[in-house]
Amino acid sequence: MEGLAGYVYKAASEGKVLTLAALLLNRSESDIRYLLGYVSQQGGQRSTPLIIAARNGHAKVVRLLLEHYRVQTQQTGTVRFDGYVIDGATALWCAAGAGHFEVVKLLVSHGANVNHTTVTNSTPLRAACFDGRLDIVKYLVENNANISIANKYDNTCLMIAAYKGHTDVVRYLLEQRADPNAKAHCGATALHFAAEAGHIDIVKELIKWRAAIVVNGHGMTPLKVAAESCKADVVELLLSHADCDRRSRIEALELLGASFANDRENYDIIKTYHYLYLAMLERFQDGDNILEKEVLPPIHAYGNRTECRNPQELESIRQDRDALHMEGLIVRERILGADNIDVSHPIIYRGAVYADNMEFEQCIKLWLHALHLRQKGNRNTHKDLLRFAQVFSQMIHLNETVKAPDIECVLRCSVLEIEQSMNRVKNISDADVHNAMDNYECNLYTFLYLVCISTKTQCSEEDQCKINKQIYNLIHLDPRTREGFTLLHLAVNSNTPVDDFHTNDVCSFPNALVTKLLLDCGAEVNAVDNEGNSALHIIVQYNRPISDFLTLHSIIISLVEAGAHTDMTNKQNKTPLDKSTTGVSEILLKTQMKMSLKCLAARAVRANDINYQDQIPRTLEEFVGFH
């Protein structure tokens, strides 16, 4: 029956109404109920024949299912739309989101709930607003769709239409008394979303309907949002309409100019100077009431520059692009505040431009500043940390000097991020745990790349001590992957992933130097993963024993000298010797096997099945247990 259900689903998906009817012909009522309620899974989607037919716009199939087989319109599934995964979507939601008007009308006329919500509280009306289908929006509203239902982030239909740039839908919703001043969780209104996206006609429409100029949760007005996003026409429109004070007006112009200086998509150094100069003139417009800047203290990442405080100072850097780039970053940090989520992006972009031009020192200064800002704001920094591993690897590959204090600084930030991501994994909901775990493991790999890079860098004794302290700090936290791997397991494992953007030019695993360094910093040599394997169990399975003999030899020596038990058994009761996959690793292991009397006694206890639980000290119980 399951195979037949697959054919039924395929026919519905492809709009083959006659095939579908033939497949269902002469079936019992219970069989039909099973076949038409069967949830098929494909590419991360879960849907019934009705849902997939509606999603793909097959009106004839939908009509057959509704009128002849009385399929329930409230069936729900999981579908993908524009890269988003939608859980709890009905056929009506899918048809509305995909723009299939005929199917929408069929479903509504057969009693589909126009206000049914998905898991994230999205309605069919919201789906139609996202797609900009005014005809579907009107039809749903005329059939009692509630325009005020917001999703789980309190984001309304008006907001999504404003952000996506659907002017006609926005106008219609406003005419239907949608609230232009409703706020999303982040504190943003429809005007914020329209301003950020640069939809000037929608901004005009919202102003006409008396949309209020308010700050969002990050202290940003629609005017500031437009300026930060380089939407000059929206900024000028809001300045001409909005009743804003002199300081707000000046800061909007400054922010606009500053944003043009370091924006990948909208870079325009001429506009940078133009708007910064306009703002400066406004500061000095009234000689009796000059509005002085409250400049930031000099910041090392910005070359310890001080922001221009008068027209003459600004004129002096007009032809100096580098100075204008730094001026832009300083202005943004002053106006937005160091804790603003958007401050770091242009800093990272400018650093990347320096890296592309082989100006690595400038790049690292900026990226370290951005990293500190993001960690201070409790942002996820796994991409930032990986970026450092990539640029350090590139530098080593090009024989450029990587400074040990820079590595130590990034390692310190990495330890902090891993500690925070360990807590996130513990406290996060089941729905988000997979992503959180991915980020956490990515941080562990990045830490190992940085340790590997440190072994290829000239370090003073003092610098090496500082680096070792960070390694010790992380080892002390005992971070584990899903498989229960410690840092030591990862260091000796050929399956440890290595990022392929510059990093794999410098880093590889198993890695003898990283293994030795981890052991020197206190890594537990006999720690086991979820399968009871120690690092020694892992390395003896290395499949390049000839071409990479030195690595294999060095790691086995390091592990044994650090106290690895060569007779330790895993959950399959296998010792490292049993797990050895090559003659070379077997020989290396045998030459290193120095069985202590303590180990021989423990093996004898296990081999003869002697009861030792609660008969010997607890520390010895564990020792006997892994033999």
Swiss-Prot record:
Q: Where in the cell is it found?
A: Cytoplasm; Nucleus
UniProt binding sites for Zn(2+): C186
UniProt repeat feature TPR, residue ranges: 344-377
Q: Which GO terms describe its cellular component?
A: Cul2-RING ubiquitin ligase complex; cytoplasm; cytosol; mitochondrion; nucleoplasm; nucleus; ubiquitin ligase complex
**What GO molecular functions are on record for this protein?**
death receptor binding; metal ion binding; ubiquitin-like ligase-substrate adaptor activity
- Which family does the record assign? Belongs to the fem-1 family.
Name the chain's protein. Answer: Protein fem-1 homolog B
Q: Which organism is it from?
A: Homo sapiens (Human)
